[in-house]
């Protein structure tokens, strides 16, 4: 009798164990089905400022929960050098916010895909569409940005001209992006080359360098130095200055000298050979369409659209632009060969 009970007990235990193991196997299989489906990666290389990248990253997560969209930041110079060196054998799928001269060089080398079917090129101003293989992200305007509070602390007046920046009282108070690594830095150089001639412009920057606190690697550097009170005067980007003012940095002031606001266009595209991936096409279409419009509306309202205009609080109106004619990569490379800093 006891033997029969033990046999029955053992049978029940075996059945219970079998049921438990079956349930565990089923759960494991189900878990592997869900976890095994890896998200498709889309890699974006960008020279955009951190706050603009953060907006894009957030919007991509909302729009594409099934994709892993990675944004890697580099300065303009670093990004251009990396893409030129790697060609089509790059880990990058999409370029976002690279200076037009470099976009054109990549395009001429066959490195960019035809993106005309993925965005409405007809929406953009005529001067921004120079190839079917890339479209604008924004028009970057430059200005003289001041920390008026720090100038008052130092007991020095606001500068009124480029010539004023050479005065000894501004020694160590000026920050400028290095044109070798920053498109923003170069556009200031190009504007003065066009205004004064190359020899006079180079002579000017030789003198200005005596007052420069630092040549920063990125266009964001001068305004960051102003906020940290490391510098009082920055040759920087109007959109970034406005963004910081709107965030509460009320000691910043935007100023234009007689020569006007230097500017350059920045673009976006897909690396040639990556345009056949559906994920890349979807991400680029969203980036070049909705997100470029949002970028213009929120941060960078200088005109890139034919019919759309946007007002950002505290953004200067009726900007006088500098002469930026002849802004080619060949001219830039020739100038930078003579740049000492």
Predicted features, each with a name:
Residues 47-48, 52-54, 74, 91-92, ...:
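Extracytoplasmic ligand-binding site segments that recognize negatively charged/polar headgroups
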Residues 36-105:
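Early extracytoplasmic/lumenal segment of secretory-pathway proteins
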Residues 113-119, 134-135, 163, 250-262, ...:
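Short beta-strand->loop
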